């Protein structure tokens, strides 16, 4: 009788349209219930039975029910699932398999089966890649996943590497392929094999892509020739090797090993500027005046060189600082080191006065055993030899940026626009509360940005600097020349690492077109998008492997009284994140560890401070002593507590 009744259908429609709904993201808790977070201010309770229909991180539309002044959300429609492709650990065996996603807030096992054609018999503890196939909000009875790739067995010592690479869908090994002979590029190569070029790298480096030669000129000027490995002499544009490098975009450097962008035969041998081996290079000759200014007579050219020495950072630094036993093997090499140190000094001063110089942070190096166990983590400060190479590379990249801009009008540029214009007024207001007066318009210019950075660098602590970081825009990769505010430069284009960066290979091809007087094509946007995405994934992979190794390394320190100096890097409502000074590990200090009475404690991300009873007790950039309270291996998280 009521079937197809238009009035009833209309009433249903009215009820549906009048029922309040909200769209948001599901946040799970460890207690079974959850919340629908609509925005920073508003969230709705999701009862445990309703949580069975959703997963942490799902974006959904929910019906909002009000009972006795309490609102709750009933999930109705899936907008975007949190899980699509994921990695996890297999439980059960044969025909009754489940997989637990490797994610701190996803604890539930999801029923699954191996995809057709996947020839692996999964067993308890195996790691796998899976893809979600069913979701309750899509009309399915339950969640269901399909195992699409076997990663490795549970006890594999190298789980951190293989699982991380699979998670981010990154290559596990070097690309296939060989380059048998050099291309005929129609370039005349200058023979510089008699000059005393040197490379300065870590002792273990095999892919040496830069060699340096310096010479004193009259009028207190110095000449620097930067010679860079020449993979585009072997790899033709559009070839199989070129396409593989374009996809990888960068060599992926992970703790313990790297996955190269080019076949190892090229990266570690044919292109590597090994000592006493003749190699083709792309080179830049520049003249530096007494104050470190790069003069206008910049010259790019093709050449052949023969590096006369593979020098090691620490040994060179020791020698220049008059310590250690090492000394250069000849007076000619010693003279090169002295001249390069002079160039470094001049360029450092020039950048300090006319651009910006980054504060030195140490690099942290994991020392691993044969089974991937962490034997030690050492902080490697950036010393004089590191700075010699850095200043030479920055100078060479400034030269390339100018030449490409003036001769072609395009290239692969690193662009950083400083502060987001939308944040300029808020930035000026924040600085004013700390006694620094800046003009909101001026700070958006390169000069204004540099002026502010110098004022911040002169502050007694890095606190204010850390406060304004959130107002900065991100660095981008662009085919259009533009300023790099972070370096304080009008333009910056890298070409000094073509073995490990595809963008540098592109700039090599463009510079060669300039040398030959040929026209060139502007790089397509899809290339810069791919490079930016790969850079993001590689950084996440490095962080993920690092987190795993830090957890392994610090596990036996949990619950002991071992003290670590730690710098506060972030403060949120839930507590503080700190970085251990000696090894770089990130740890979390929950708010209850800071003060037992919650009402007397204010953790403010906005102000970067922790207040107890109205008094500021901690602030970002403070260095405090902590002990390790707990290491949770399943989430690779380190929990610390302040030393009372």
From Swiss-Prot:
<keyword id="KW-0540">Nuclease</keyword>
<dbReference type="InterPro" id="IPR004476">
    <property type="entry name" value="RNase_II/RNase_R"/>
</dbReference>
<keyword id="KW-0694">RNA-binding</keyword>
<dbReference type="Pfam" id="PF00575">
    <property type="entry name" value="S1"/>
</dbReference>
<keyword id="KW-0963">Cytoplasm</keyword>
<feature type="domain" description="RNB">
    <location>
        <begin position="189"/>
        <end position="516"/>
    </location>
</feature>
<dbReference type="Pfam" id="PF08206">
    <property type="entry name" value="OB_RNB"/>
</dbReference>
<dbReference type="InterPro" id="IPR050180">
    <property type="entry name" value="RNR_Ribonuclease"/>
</dbReference>
<dbReference type="InterPro" id="IPR013223">
    <property type="entry name" value="RNase_B_OB_dom"/>
</dbReference>
<dbReference type="InterPro" id="IPR001900">
    <property type="entry name" value="RNase_II/R"/>
</dbReference>
<dbReference type="Pfam" id="PF00773">
    <property type="entry name" value="RNB"/>
</dbReference>
<dbReference type="GO" id="GO:0003723">
    <property type="term" value="F:RNA binding"/>
</dbReference>
<protein>
    <recommendedName>
        <fullName>Exoribonuclease 2</fullName>
        <ecNumber>3.1.13.1</ecNumber>
    </recommendedName>
</protein>
<comment type="function">
    <text>Involved in mRNA degradation. Hydrolyzes single-stranded polyribonucleotides processively in the 3' to 5' direction.</text>
</comment>
<dbReference type="GO" id="GO:0008859">
    <property type="term" value="F:exoribonuclease II activity"/>
</dbReference>
<keyword id="KW-0269">Exonuclease</keyword>
<dbReference type="InterPro" id="IPR022966">
    <property type="entry name" value="RNase_II/R_CS"/>
</dbReference>
<keyword id="KW-0378">Hydrolase</keyword>
<feature type="domain" description="S1 motif">
    <location>
        <begin position="561"/>
        <end position="643"/>
    </location>
</feature>
<dbReference type="InterPro" id="IPR012340">
    <property type="entry name" value="NA-bd_OB-fold"/>
</dbReference>
<dbReference type="InterPro" id="IPR011804">
    <property type="entry name" value="RNase_II"/>
</dbReference>
<dbReference type="GO" id="GO:0005829">
    <property type="term" value="C:cytosol"/>
</dbReference>
<comment type="similarity">
    <text>Belongs to the RNR ribonuclease family. RNase II subfamily.</text>
</comment>
<dbReference type="GO" id="GO:0006402">
    <property type="term" value="P:mRNA catabolic process"/>
</dbReference>
<dbReference type="InterPro" id="IPR011129">
    <property type="entry name" value="CSD"/>
</dbReference>
<dbReference type="InterPro" id="IPR003029">
    <property type="entry name" value="S1_domain"/>
</dbReference>
């Amino acid at each position: 009788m009521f079937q197809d009744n238009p009035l009833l259908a209309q009433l249903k429609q009215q009820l549906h349209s009048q029922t309040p709904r909200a769209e948001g993201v599901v946040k799970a808790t460890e207690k079974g219930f959850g919340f629908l977070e609509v925005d920073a201010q508003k969230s709705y309770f999701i009862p445990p039975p309703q949580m069975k229909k959703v997963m942490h991180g799902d974006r959904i539309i929910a019906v909002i029910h009000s009972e006795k002044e309490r609102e709750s959300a009933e999930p109705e429609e899936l907008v975007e699932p949190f899980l699509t492709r994921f990695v996890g650990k297999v439980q059960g065996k044969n025909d009754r398999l489940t997989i637990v996603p490797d994610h701190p807030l996803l604890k539930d096992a999801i029923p699954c089966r191996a995809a057709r054609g996947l020839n692996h018999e999964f067993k308890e503890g195996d790691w796998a890649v899976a893809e979600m196939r069913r979701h309750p909000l899509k009309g399915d009875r339950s969640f269901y996943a399909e195992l699409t790739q076997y990663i490795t067995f549970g006890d594999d010592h190298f789980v951190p590497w293989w699982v991380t690479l699979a998670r981010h869908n990154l290559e596990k090994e070097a690309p296939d392929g060989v380059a048998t002979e050099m291309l005929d590029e129609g370039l005349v190569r200058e023979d510089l094999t008699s000059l005393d070029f040197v490379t300065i790298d870590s002792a273990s480096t095999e892919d040496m892509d830069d060699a340096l030669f310096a010479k004193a000129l009259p009028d207190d000027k110095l000449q620097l020739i930067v010679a860079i490995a020449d993979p585009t002499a072997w790899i033709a544009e559009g070839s199989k090797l070129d396409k593989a490098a374009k996809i990888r975009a960068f060599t992926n450097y992970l703790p313990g090993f790297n996955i190269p962008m080019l076949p190892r035969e090229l990266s570690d041998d044919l292109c590597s500027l090994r000592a006493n081996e003749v190699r083709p290079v792309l080179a830049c000759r520049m003249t530096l005046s007494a104050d470190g200014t790069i003069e206008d007579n910049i010259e790019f050219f093709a050449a052949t060189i023969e590096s006369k020495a593979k020098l090691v950072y620490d040994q060179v630094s020791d020698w220049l600082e008059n310590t250690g036993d090492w000394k250069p093997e000849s007076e000619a090499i010693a003279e090169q080191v002295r001249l390069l140190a002079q160039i470094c000094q001049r360029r450092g001063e020039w950048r300090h006065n006319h651009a910006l110089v980054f504060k030195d942070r140490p690099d942290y190096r994991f020392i691993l055993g044969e089974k991937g166990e962490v034997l030690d983590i050492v902080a490697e400060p950036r010393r004089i030899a590191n700075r010699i190479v850095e200043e030479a590379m920055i100078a060479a990249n400034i030269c390339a940026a100018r030449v490409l801009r003036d001769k072609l009008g395009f290239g692969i540029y690193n662009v950083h626009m400083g502060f987001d214009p939308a944040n300029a007024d808020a930035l000026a207001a924040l600085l004013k509360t700390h006694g620094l007066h800046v003009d909101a318009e001026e700070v958006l210019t390169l000069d204004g940005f540099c002026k502010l950075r110098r004022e911040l660098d002169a502050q007694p602590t890095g606190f204010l600097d850390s406060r304004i970081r959130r107002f900065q825009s991100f660095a981008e990769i662009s085919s259009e020349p533009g300023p790099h505010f972070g370096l304080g430069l009008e333009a910056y284009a890298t070409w000094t690492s073509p073995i490990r960066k595809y963008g540098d290979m592109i700039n090599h091809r463009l510079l060669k077109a300039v040398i030959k007087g040929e026209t060139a094509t502007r790089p397509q946007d899809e290339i810069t998008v791919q490079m930016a995405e790969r850079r993001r994934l590689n950084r996440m992979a490095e962080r993920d492997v690092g987190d795993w190794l830090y957890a392994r390394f610090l596990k036996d320190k949990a619950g002991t009284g071992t003290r670590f100096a730690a710098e506060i890097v972030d403060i949120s409502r839930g507590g503080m994140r700190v970085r251990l000074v000696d090894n770089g590990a990130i740890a979390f200090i929950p708010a209850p560890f800071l003060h037992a009475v919650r009402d007397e404690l204010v953790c403010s991300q906005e102000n970067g401070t922790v207040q107890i009873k109205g008094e500021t007790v901690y602030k970002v950039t403070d260095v405090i002593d902590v002990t390790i309270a707990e290491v949770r291996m399943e989430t690779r998280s380190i929990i610390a507590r302040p030393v009372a």
